[in-house]
């Protein structure tokens, strides 16, 4: 038994030494692990599916402003990191405002947990951005001044925008974040 335990500790030690050996890529910071974002995307899709199957008490009370989700890669790559971060943060803020309105509009209680989850996930993404030293976003006094937005009037459209925004611009920002780049030690 002692030999088994000793071998296990030796294997663990060798794995740690191999992992931290100079000259190899350093492991990603946990905050940069895209599996977290993938989980948020899955939950956003679940909310969208639940909304599509809803027949009663699941509509928006008014149309809402949401971010554009289409990414022109030539334009995106010409933007500096601060501009990209501001675009993502303004989109997250718009989605949070829209989801808060949806939460108060929807009377179907089965959807409340999906909407609450989506709002919590947006707050978590904002916390991730802060931990990556991305400057805090200051929302505008009015959404009229925001570029790259449009309006949706259905809850399903809102949740589809939510999914696509996470899959697109949020993912791109996290992939390109300086703190998430793997450096050779």
From Swiss-Prot:
Cellular localization per UniProt: Secreted
A Gene Ontology biological process term: erythrocyte maturation
Disulfide-linked positions: 32-180, 54-58
GO CC terms: extracellular space
Keyword line: Disulfide bond, Erythrocyte maturation, Hormone, Secreted, Signal
Leader peptide range in chain numbering: 1-22
Gene3D superfamilies the record matches: 1.20.1250.10
GO molecular function: cytokine activity; erythropoietin receptor binding; hormone activity
Pfam families for this protein: EPO_TPO
Main location per the UniProt record: secreted
Role: Erythropoietin is the principal hormone involved in the regulation of erythrocyte differentiation and the maintenance of a physiological level of circulating erythrocyte mass.
Similarity comment: Belongs to the EPO/TPO family.
Name the record gives this protein: Erythropoietin
Species for this entry: Epinephelus coioides
Gene from which this protein is expressed: epo
């Amino acid at each position: 038994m002692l030999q088994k335990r000793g071998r296990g500790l030796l294997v663990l030690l060798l794995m740690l030494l191999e992992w931290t050996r100079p000259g190899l890529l350093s492991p990603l910071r946990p905050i940069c692990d895209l599996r977290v974002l993938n989980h948020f995307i899955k939950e956003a899709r679940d909310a969208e599916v639940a909304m599509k199957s809803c027949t009663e008490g699941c509509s928006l009370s008014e149309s809402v402003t949401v971010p554009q989700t289409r990414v022109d890669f030539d334009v995106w790559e010409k933007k500096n990191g601060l501009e990209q971060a501001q675009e993502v943060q303004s989109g997250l803020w718009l989605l949070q405002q829209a989801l808060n309105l949806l939460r108060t509009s929807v009377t179907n209680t089965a959807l409340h947990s999906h909407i609450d989850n989506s709002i919590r996930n947006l707050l978590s993404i904002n916390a991730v951005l802060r931990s990556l030293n991305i400057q805090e976003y200051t929302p505008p006094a009015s959404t009229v001044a925001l570029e790259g937005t449009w309006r949706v009037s259905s809850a399903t459209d809102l949740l589809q925008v939510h999914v696509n925004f996470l899959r697109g611009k949020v993912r791109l920002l996290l992939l390109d974040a300086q703190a998430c780049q793997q450096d050779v030690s």
